[in-house]
Amino acid sequence: IGARCFYRCEALERVNIPSTVRHVGTYAFNATKLYTNEETDYVYVDSWLVAVKNQELHKTVTKLDLKQGTVGIIDNCFYKAPILEAVQLPDSVRIVGQYAFSGIETLVRFEAGKNLEVLQEGAFANCTGLYVLLLNRSLQEIGAYAFYGCSTLDNNSLDGNSIIPQSVKRIGAYAFMQTMLWGKPENNIIYAGNWVVGFAENAKLGAAELKDSVVGIADNAFFQCGTLTSLKNLSKCAYIGTAAFYECTALETVSLNPRLETVEAYTFYKCKSLFRVSVPTMLRSVGRSAFYGCSNLKTLDFSESAVFASVGDFAFYGCSNLETVTFGENLTGLGRYSFKNCSTLTAVELPDTVTAVPEHAFANCSALVTLKLGSGVTSIGDKAFYKCAGLSEVVLPDSVRTVGKSAFYKCVSLATLTLGNSLERIGDFAFYND
């Protein structure tokens, strides 16, 4: 529910918020009857705390006491509360909104309830006095900048093991930057518990090694680390975040955890030295621009995973040395521009589970000579095989109904074309060759 979503809906007096809602923006219900008719200082909509009606309350409360049954806390709810010292959430709270407790310099202690799932972006940013952090064992996500600028926060242990519970599946970008953790790198790598959250400034990492207990890599953890060439123990990481190795231009090889399910968006973006990637046996998807511009990558075999299903937009765009790709039998989704400008790719074989070849998917794959489309393909998007100059034969299966504009534009070697019996439309310039 976005910021000011129902602002000044003055007749609104009842709302049921479903359990699927994970975010309520600032002022979402202000100036409604829900707000104006509330007689207490805290304004609740269904089970969400959506406002502190009396801002003077911030000047008197040192310990927060929310009612049992509260499910979520709205964005910015206690922003810069001047004397709040401790927060202990009831077990019912699942979600703490963006910057909900940020900027509270007096806050020393935060204790999550048993069912907290998400700390959203900046939830405790710049709480400079925060020292005691007790997170629960069902927490799944710590958002970007969640504890940014908490300058006294250290790696206090949870059960003698880690400040981060084992249940956590994602840590956002710079969640612990400018905390005490940032000043205590281990071999130039910065950890929050058993998670990698960054690297030391001006570090020359080279062939680096993660500690044996490592479980995950946060978003942007090695962002533009131009000296990293390899990373031992990366295969221990069950979670690797968005843009984790963004523009690590010297990174050459990576060995991924066999149980890794997703290569997130921009994970290896423009890692131009990367030439070998192990495909996890449980891999399900590759995100947007995950390997964009990995110009030294030569081969990919997704058939090593029996559950591999989707390739995101721009995922392998500009992998100019990529020669072979094997998709396996369960691919269903192929992204726009996903293999565009893969100029050395020689063969594409799509399984019967693929229903569409989207726009620009294999455009400018000038070395492509073999194309086999599965029997499930119903559409070929605009410029899908644009300027694939090596193609000499194209067979469209009977399932194909539409061929988009310029789909095979300037395929200058094309000599044989077989059209399926279900074809309904061929777009402008589809097979044009000037």
Regions found by a protein language model. Give the residues of each.
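Structural signature of tandem-repeat unit edges
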Residues: 9-23, 32-46, 55-72, 81-95, ...
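Consensus positions within tandem repeat domains that build extended binding/scaffold surfaces
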Residues: 2-7, 26-28, 75-77, 97-100, ...
